Amino acid sequence: MESLASLYKNHIATLQERTRDALARFKLDALLIHSGELFNVFLDDHPYPFKVNPQFKAWVPVTQVPNCWLLVDGVNKPKLWFYLPVDYWHNVEPLPNSFWTEDVEVIALPKADGIGSLLPAARGNIGYIGPVPERALQLGIEASNINPKGVIDYLHYYRSFKTEYELACMREAQKMAVNGHRAAEEAFRSGMSEFDINIAYLTATGHRDTDVPYSNIVALNEHAAVLHYTKLDHQAPEEMRSFLLDAGAEYNGYAADLTRTWSAKSDNDYAQLVKDVNDEQLALIATMKAGVSYVDYHIQFHQRIAKLLRKHQIITDMSEEAMVENDLTGPFMPHGIGHPLGLQVHDVAGFMQDDSGTHLAAPAKYPYLRCTRILQPGMVLTIEPGIYFIESLLAPWREGQFSKHFNWQKIEALKPFGGIRIEDNVVIHENNVENMTRDLKLA
């Protein structure tokens, strides 16, 4: 495999080209990209966990250091002022010397407020991208050039097309997440609580709870019906029925986002339903290709959901077409089939149809779908179908003309299992789709 250093060199060349184009289009001289700052908890003296500006970590794999600055103009070597204070209260990261530092000019910044004297004197035509607009104003950046929408839309659109460096980082993140999922399944099988399963996951991935790209969803039994369940019970339930784990990892700022669901027993209806959702998810991925709208795959999976609802006699006496047409599949899969993935878990530009930021909303019938793009080579997306038994979504169907088609007895029997979600991360290539998750043999 090509070294990360050579992949990074090409990555920087791509970012430089995008920057030149953006600066020319919006008549700017350079971009000043801020890693961010620490923000204290209200009325307290300690900060919230630091989360770096995604536009900053697109350039350099520096994810834990606030008060850093990048100056890029698309021509000259990117200039990084790296925050390096004299501080005996807190850990101070050393000046970087890694695979990427040959391609970036790295300069120590001893004082957070010292950046002003180091920037070019003429700043009226520099754009600021970062989370602290007031800092940009203090530096003399024009208000109209602070997080300029056109520039950000342009950069976001092209972030959809991953460089080979980015794909290499995402494959490494996959490896970490797969290790975590295997450790978590083992913890579940041994009867651990959600809290302890989460600890097992973090240990296996080498992450702290604040390092994972999103809060781990560690859901036993009926908790799997809460789509973003993050409570983490300390006590294991008396009876283990099911386990849904939606948890990722991060490598050089790039995310993995995987979900698996396990049944405690292998010989019940729920276990068969888990197997069937998994099979249908793989079957859908096998049909994916460049040039097709992501929306089409979402709609196709509702047809697959209908097939499973019929097979398992959860919905009866109704054709699969009628189920989808009348949205009887909706309460069972209330979220989208997935989303773009990259520097952010819900990566940017899912609705953007061009580099001017033209927005195409999700279909009215499926408002929670996070992507309406035509799939193109270089895109990375999640494919994460599910079937859930959520009373608040099922309740409206208990009355009315369609109620008789719901096998309420079967639904009540499945509700204690919560739900099912299976999620892989896929790369769209010119002539094939790469399933980064299954390539690592995660069942």
Curated annotation (Swiss-Prot):
GO biological process: proteolysis
Cellular component terms per the entry's GO annotation: cytosol
EC number: 3.4.13.9
Cofactor(s) needed by this chain: Mn(2+)
Chain positions recorded as Mn(2+) 2 binding sites: D246, D257, E423
CDD domains found in the cross-reference section: Prolidase (cd01087)
Gene Ontology MF, one: aminopeptidase activity
Catalytically driven reaction(s): Xaa-L-Pro dipeptide + H2O = an L-alpha-amino acid + L-proline
Entry keywords, A to Z: Dipeptidase, Hydrolase, Manganese, Metal-binding, Metalloprotease, Protease
Pfam family, one: Peptidase_M24
Comment on bound cofactor: Binds 2 manganese ions per subunit.
Residue positions binding Mn(2+) 1: D257, H339, E384, E423
InterPro entries documented for this protein: Creatin/AminoP/Spt16_N, Creatinase/aminopeptidase-like, PepQ_N, Pept_M24, Peptidase_M24B_aminopep-P_CS, X-Pro_dipept-like, X_Pro_dipept
Protein family per UniProt: Belongs to the peptidase M24B family. Bacterial-type prolidase subfamily.
Biological function: Splits dipeptides with a prolyl residue in the C-terminal position.
HAMAP family hit by this protein: X_Pro_dipeptid
Protein name: Xaa-Pro dipeptidase
